[in-house]
Structure formats: structure tokens, C-alpha cells
UniProtKB/Swiss-Prot annotation:
It holds the Pfam family Ribosomal_L36. It comes from Clavibacter michiganensis subsp. michiganensis (strain NCPPB 382). SUPFAM superfamilies: Ribosomal protein L36 (SSF57840). GO terms for cellular component: ribonucleoprotein complex; ribosome. This is Large ribosomal subunit protein bL36B. GO terms for biological process: translation. Belongs to the bacterial ribosomal protein bL36 family. InterPro entries: Ribosomal_bL36 (IPR000473), Ribosomal_bL36_sp (IPR035977), Ribosomal_L36_bact (IPR047621). Keywords: Ribonucleoprotein, Ribosomal protein.
Amino acid sequence: MKVRNSIKALKKLPGAQVVRRRGRVFVINKQNPRNKARQG
């Protein structure tokens, strides 16, 4: 999982889902799990 300042680019990729957990923003991608990231 990458920790990014901005997850804007990752959320545009196919299969990406934006999820809020514990006050942090996560991007989960089941199609391509390499694009997993957290902001904050």
C-alpha cells in the first residue's frame, strides 16, 4: 500500500473504489491490487 498526498490519479483508474475508514481516505482496487493507497 502506498501513502500518498493525493489519491486523485488513483481513483480514476478502472476498478478503483474510494473508501473512508477511521478518518482516512483509502483507494482499493480489486482488479489491480497494486493500486492500493491511503491518504493522510
